[in-house]
Amino acid sequence: MKSVGLITEYNPFHNGHLFHATLSKQRSETNVTIAIMSGNFVMRGEPAIYHKFKRTEMALSAVDLVVELPLIGSLSSSDTFAEIAIKTAQYLDIDIISFGSESASLKDLQYLATQMIDYEKHPDFKEKLKQGKSYPRILSELTHNDTLLQSPNNILGISYLKAMQQFAPHMSALTIKREGSLHHQKVIDHHHFASGTSIRRSLMNDNVDWKNVVPNQIQSLYCKPHTTVEDTFPFIKHQLITQPKESLHSIYTINEGFENRLQTMIHRSDSFESLLSNLNTKRYTQTYIQRVLMNVLLNITKDDVNKEINAVRVLGMSEKGRSYLKYLKANYPNRHYITNVNQKTAHYFKNEIKATHVYNLLSNQSQTDFNTPLVRI
């Protein structure tokens, strides 16, 4: 069975995602479409607006199999996000990775990916990082290509292509041009497509604009967001005030000395937004700071990080997805494709289980990794 993989967050699922999934199936000429989806926390450095089980149900309107991207991928830089996603795709024997981009020129993006792998080995690259320059800015300077590197989906696509060259050279790639609104557009201003940011804002504000840009057949699944990033503040504050500096230093993604700034600025902040503003510097992007704060919230330490894939958590599937899962189990009997988390399998997903517990504290949800059945359609 030939498969195409989509690396996703679906926060929430919308017409742009449906467009991407539909064209990916058509252009890849594959039998099965697989979504590797972030769980309850997403790459922006915040909790997803709906828990992963609801988002899985949404996704199955367009794909055949949904698996969870390991938490470490979701709360990392684009390169680590891509590395873990591609390794997960390899574990699932995916043939083609399809991603959206502003460029839609696979040749240009692959050329930049190859350039970057070489540039990152140079002493100049590491020196610029030490100077506090952001990763996209350094790459823009080194490659002399501002246009492609100004677009977030291009940058992420390049990270996928780098990871494929390094970890899965047999895998093919396909890119599909994004349609409609810009990635971080805050207002729904298109009759069919909109950014995730604008849809989340519409849902939060209880207006109905989101209905124009979400597939009709799944609109009944949408409701006011389960939680927002602001809900995390009391828990983050507790962690920063009660944890010793040495413990904070061990938190995943914290760079040398940033724990000092965290413990200073928490006493000057009365909300997540104000903490973010107080922590802001030229050296660190807002997204980096938010991911650090989520790792503080979840107490994810450097010792918790494992970039190898030892098992995959299956969240949901269609009949076609079920057939593909049977194919995987028959062809890779030593791999672990987990559809039911229990005492025997929980050790594979310690970070994800903890993230679900914390998400439930934030959102007053009750669906855990142990009591929620596989989503089937």
Curated annotation (Swiss-Prot):
It catalyses: cytidine(34) in elongator tRNA(Met) + acetate + ATP = N(4)-acetylcytidine(34) in elongator tRNA(Met) + AMP + diphosphate. The keyword tRNA-binding applies. Keywords: ATP-binding, Cytoplasm, Ligase, Nucleotide-binding, RNA-binding, tRNA processing, tRNA-binding. It is found in: Cytoplasm. InterPro entries: Rossmann-like_a/b/a_fold (IPR014729), tRNA(Met)_cyd_acetate_ligase (IPR008513). GO terms for molecular function: ATP binding; ligase activity, forming carbon-nitrogen bonds; tRNA binding. Its EC number is 6.3.4.-. Pfam families: HIGH_NTase1. One of its GO terms (biological process) is tRNA modification. Catalyzes the formation of N(4)-acetylcytidine (ac(4)C) at the wobble position of elongator tRNA(Met), using acetate and ATP as substrates. First activates an acetate ion to form acetyladenylate (Ac-AMP) and then transfers the acetyl group to tRNA to form ac(4)C34. This is tRNA(Met) cytidine acetate ligase. The gene is tmcAL.
